[in-house]
Amino acid sequence: MNHLVLGYVGLVIGVIVTKKSMVWRVGQVGSVLLMLPATVLVNMNMTISNVSYMMTSDFVSLGLTVLSIWLLPLMLLASQQHMVSESLIYQRVFVGCQVFLTGALVLAFMASDLLLFYIAFESTLLPTLMLITRWGAQKERYQAGTYFMFFTLVGSLPLLICLIGQYQMVGSLALDLSYEGVFQLSYLVNFWWVGCILAFLVKLPLYGVHLWLPKAHVEAPIAGSMVLAGVLLKLGGYGMMRVSLMWGATAMLSSEVFLALALWGIVVMGGICLRQTDLKSLIAYSSVGHMALVVGGVLTGVAWGYNGAMVLMIAHGLVSSCLFCLANLWYERSSTRNLSGSRGLIMIFPLISSGWFLMSLMNMALPPAINLFGELVAMVALYNWSPYSIVYMSLGAVLTAAYSLYLFGMSQWGNTMKNYKNLYTITSREYLLTTLHLVPAIYLIFYLGLMF
């Protein structure tokens, strides 16, 4: 596992020093080669106790690690078309940012020490900020970058203070130890727990601290949107799972407020999605609603909640990343993301419309999509916590189905505008990109045991 992280360091160096014509090829081939160790990890029954010092892998981290590694070559594949006009130095920086970001994510998911996890967690800020502010499409990208940086830093500071306090009290930040009873169920545990998970709630994000996400998604280039929706949001869910597993029931005493916000966020985000006219904005707000269910599953503190959140995070990473790719595919040809101006795509690109159809169905958790299994298991855990939660979850499910059908219907059906009838055809690169999102999403339906 140490070699896997070092591989990304070597790939960053390779992208910097290679000749001009080989920058993208080195990045793509290197990222594909680094996928090979990930396939080996999937077939190994690894526990937290049989991995090397400072690095770990278990059922919590393995799926997200493989997801991060899988998405890197797809991000490079999606970005190559609109980056060819950039100067060589900017192309090197762009590819280097994506590789470095993936390496930091892999390190965060494999860290066995909370301090190492925090360093990797914060290391994702700078490359993501560069992707948004340098390669965003509109002038509003600077405001989006400011929101992203402000929310991330403000949320992360209490986490650092809590980690320092934990080391002072316990003398250890290891993830494989249990720290129940340190506070002796005093009122301090409530402050500690809120301080610890605030950074993760902002990263997910939870309804109420989600303002940075739609702005970042809308203004980011396609690679930024893919990594944000695919992996970065899951970093928050992973951190919550790790901290709650370490502290057990002691840390769950003050979770009711966040659970209530999560349930309310599912409903509110569904309503907001139905009012959107921008493709990327709708997909971004839908991510907040799905991650609210992840928050609910984790904060219940039971195995069903953890498993449901885990499956839902991986499923959402593939589905939302593909939806952003499909939205970008249309934006590159029409220079618009407006739903009212995107009608009739099924008449222009019929094969790609099948990708839209499948991903919309998966986004609404239609059987037998993998999203359905994650949502059902998380809902069972939430119902066990409070039977009244079924009201919010049922309403959220109806709204999710409504905005998924709204997204597909508004973009695919209707009469095509005359000025969009002579667009250049879909390339093999874009077909491959869509297929590489669909294949694992369908494969996991038959092999759910890989994530449990």
UniProtKB/Swiss-Prot annotation:
Core subunit of the mitochondrial membrane respiratory chain NADH dehydrogenase (Complex I) that is believed to belong to the minimal assembly required for catalysis. Complex I functions in the transfer of electrons from NADH to the respiratory chain. The immediate electron acceptor for the enzyme is believed to be ubiquinone. The keyword Electron transport applies. It is found in: Mitochondrion membrane. GO terms for molecular function: NADH dehydrogenase (ubiquinone) activity; ubiquinone binding. The chain crosses the membrane at residues 4-24, 29-49, 59-79, 88-110, 114-136, 144-164, 182-202, 221-241, 252-272, 282-304, 309-331, 345-365, 390-410, 432-452. It catalyses: a ubiquinone + NADH + 5 H(+)(in) = a ubiquinol + NAD(+) + 4 H(+)(out). Signal peptide: none annotated. This is NADH-ubiquinone oxidoreductase chain 4. GO terms for biological process: aerobic respiration; ATP synthesis coupled electron transport; electron transport coupled proton transport. Keywords: Electron transport, Membrane, Mitochondrion, NAD, Respiratory chain, Translocase, Transmembrane, Transmembrane helix, Transport, Ubiquinone. Disulfide bonds: none annotated. It is a multi-pass membrane protein. Belongs to the complex I subunit 4 family. Its EC number is 7.1.1.2. PANTHER family: NADH-UBIQUINONE OXIDOREDUCTASE CHAIN 4. GO terms for cellular component: mitochondrial membrane; respiratory chain complex I.
